[in-house]
Amino acid sequence: MRTSQYLLSTLKETPADAEVISHQLMLRAGMIRKLASGLYTWLPTGLRVLNKVENIVREEMNYAGAIEVSMPVVQPADLWQESGRWEQYGPELLRFVDRGDRPFVLGPTHEEVITDLVRNEISSYKQLPLNFYQIQTKFRDEVRPRFGVMRSREFLMKDAYSFHTTQESLQETYEAMYAAYSRIFSRMGLDFRAVQADTGSIGGNASHEFQVLAQSGEDDIVFSTASDYAANIELAEALAPATGRAAANQPMQLVNTPDARTIAELVEQHGLPIEKTVKTLLVHASEESGHALVALLVRGDHELNEVKAEKLALVASPLTFANEAEIRALVNAGPGSLGPVNLPLPIVADRAVAAMSDFGAGANIDGKHYFGINWERDAALPQIADIRNVIEGDPSPDGKGTLLIKRGIEVGHIFQLGTKYTEALNATVQGEDGRNQLMTMGCYGIGVTRVVAAAIEQNHDERGIIWPDAIAPFQVAILPMNMHKSFRVKEVAERLYDGLRAKGIEVLLDDRKERPGVMFADMELIGIPHTIVIGDRNLDNNEIEYKYRRSGDKLMISVDEIEAFLQAQIAR
């Protein structure tokens, strides 16, 4: 490809509304342009990268035995009503009616459509297992689209759905998809972790996320220093302290704390170590509990894990915190003065709180705290559960090493759905015993557009993008210095361009009448891995300059050897 015949829409300045580096660089490198909030046009450079990501995904899915289909983006509402998600799904589901006043949705996902297809096409256990996938546009009406294509409203996704008659069969496909995903992201040159994850709104049993490590990531991922344990922080187990509870050494005292409405203020004003404080959080209780509110206790330096807490039988789902009026109606004290002593509510204490002694907490009286609280002496030991986020240095749940926490960008997610959708849509097959049985499902997604942004977040410097070779828009850039004034430079550049193309190498020849500085800046911004600089001075020595984008290393290579050299570099 020649730049004179190509849309090279690079920008010198960073657009003001671009928050993260991938969004900034995708705009500056001429990969995307914003059409409306959360909607982007993919320009030629961006589309080349997107197509390469898509091709790797398709190759590995086919290799793993999945079957490609294509399902409509527009879906009839009756399928969503049948599954129950018409009412459950929030405003992210874009609903509309056609000219016949029939309701439809723009598909954010395709569980209903594929389950409907399979229940009509598959009738016997002998036809299973089957794993269908598509690479298709999705639409989610995000309340606040942000970070460019990282969280857009319209995006490209690979979604796969497998159907089985036994859990063993589902497990086999799940493991095959886990392996396929690992190959996909490895081929793309990404530094990623597969982590145990919560199944969330999709539901089901087992679940793993594939997270690309990046400082800008929205997720906290946890992994062990001494094993392959890895989990999303929502799911990572916080073990009980190994030392157990120390003996009581202090009497309980009521202390005036009129200006201490938070743990930080309590610690600062009264010199109490933060690990000797307890936060009391009131949330709405489940109907089965028989109470309006339930108290959750976590140590002052720990954070409540809302995903874990929501799974408690006492807690209403979704988890919602009580407001001040609701709290005062039951306790007659504000949120900053709550504690477990004489609290007339069911209480769940985190494991770390249950192991505390001589601690401080609110007295359920405005402007007062108790110091020196001890379980069983001053307050009954409540229900104990793991309800906090782990922190760095906690012991790994598998007993090997301690935990580290890094930021990650979720690019893939695999689920064992079980019978959630087949039961709702009555998708059955005839089993070996001749009776109808529900199929069990797996679900496997990759955010194709998000992968592009995640790769940039992980691979860039102050000059621009540094693409992994497998997904770079071009493999080689040829920069001929003043080729319009030098016949020799032009001749060598054209010969090299034709030779590389004949070998199947994707090459961009910069034949613009531009200053060398502009040419260098654009190629580094776009992130092409291998750059060839052709100039009269080096040609005097029958040499060409080679530069590797990732390391910045430069070499002088003989004109006669440059094609073979580039082939070897690309094949590495």
UniProtKB/Swiss-Prot annotation:
**Domain writeup:** Consists of three domains: the N-terminal catalytic domain, the editing domain and the C-terminal anticodon-binding domain.
Q: Where in the cell is it found?
A: Cytoplasm
Which keywords label this protein? Aminoacyl-tRNA synthetase, ATP-binding, Cytoplasm, Ligase, Nucleotide-binding, Protein biosynthesis
Q: What is the lineage of its organism?
A: Bacteria, Pseudomonadati, Pseudomonadota, Gammaproteobacteria, Enterobacterales
Name of this chain's protein: Proline--tRNA ligase
A GO CC annotation recorded here is:
cytosol
Please give the function described in this protein's UniProt entry: Catalyzes the attachment of proline to tRNA(Pro) in a two-step reaction: proline is first activated by ATP to form Pro-AMP and then transferred to the acceptor end of tRNA(Pro). As ProRS can inadvertently accommodate and process non-cognate amino acids such as alanine and cysteine, to avoid such errors it has two additional distinct editing activities against alanine. One activity is designated as 'pretransfer' editing and involves the tRNA(Pro)-independent hydrolysis of activated Ala-AMP.
Record-linked NCBIfam families: PRK09194.1, proS_fam_II
Record-level Gene Ontology MF annotations: aminoacyl-tRNA deacylase activity; ATP binding; proline-tRNA ligase activity
Q: Which PROSITE patterns match?
A: AA_TRNA_LIGASE_II (PS50862)
Instruction: Write the gene name.
Output: proS
